């Protein structure tokens, strides 16, 4: 058995699910809760995969490497599939109203997948986890994303 470290982070962002048979094909948003589960890669080298202090990783490291990635890249943004023609058109709209702040031109984040919670969780485990945790001896083993308190998806072991 291995020890696991779990931490969650809340973000708010929009998306639309291209090809969805119901209202999720429309522009909408969620207050997501993203749960990260990490394990040590060094179970053979360190006692039970724990460091000299007796932990897998400091919770602050999970926050700075994974939670803050979410905060900086997805929070309060619109996540759009790079194949979504509607989102591409919306991202090009220029607002000329004095009451709309246009100083942030990074409101749209284009990703190489249809932004379902399932695909978002897989992307975090397969792409972002290895990038952000590189050199730490820690692996992001699973992600659970709650779209609502009633509906969630998980990817990983």
Identify the function of each model-found stretch.
Residues 1-157:
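Charge-rich, low-complexity N-terminal segments
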